[in-house]
Amino acid sequence: MTITRGDFKLRLNQGEFTDSQIIVMLGENGTGKTTFIKMLAGSKLDIDEEGSQVHEIPQFSVSYKNQHMSNRKFEITVRDLIHRKIPNAYAEHQFVSDVMKPLKIEELMDKSFNKLSGGEKQRVALALCLGKSADIYLIDEPSAFLDSEQRIIASKVIKRFILQMKKAAFARFHNGYVFGR
């Protein structure tokens, strides 16, 4: 797979990943981490210099948490958003105890999504991502807008969830120290 954007070229060789594996991507800005995640998510990207399609997406189900928070206005409560987007996960005791409680989603349930802070929205977005049934979880910058304690908690939640569910994840962080804990 090759992605070309001006002078920037991202080449990916064939690789493998297994269940219960988290691949953490670290690197300087502009090195292709988000582009790689978007490729796996199936986002439309560029055409290479020869005019051919730049990537082929393997067939698997994906749950994707974008690095940027949506500017879309959700005129609903967090409870309604969760019940609409991940009703099955929210009904599972293990998901509630392993994801919702550590991320403190319960205390946000009756708040309007639009009125949440950036960190609160980030925690909800992470819960929504993990609440979707998928083979691979693509988690782009899950620690953005979170304070240091919340970053550690979010990293532990991701790790525990992926290991227990025997899934694979690609996670992009600016700080590898946080995920290593």
UniProtKB/Swiss-Prot annotation:
Tissue spec: Mostly expressed in roots and leaves, and, to a lower extent, in stems, flowers and siliques.
Entry superkingdom: Eukaryota
Domain ABC transporter stretches: 20-176
Annotated ATP binding sites: 27-34
Gene Ontology molecular functions: ATP binding; ATP hydrolysis activity
Keywords, alphabetical: ATP-binding, Nucleotide-binding, Transport
Record Pfam families: ABC_tran
Family: Belongs to the ABC transporter superfamily. ABCE family.
Name of the molecule in the record: ABC transporter E family member 3
Organism: Arabidopsis thaliana
Top-level taxonomy: Eukaryota, Viridiplantae, Streptophyta, Embryophyta, Tracheophyta
Gene name for this UniProt entry: ABCE3
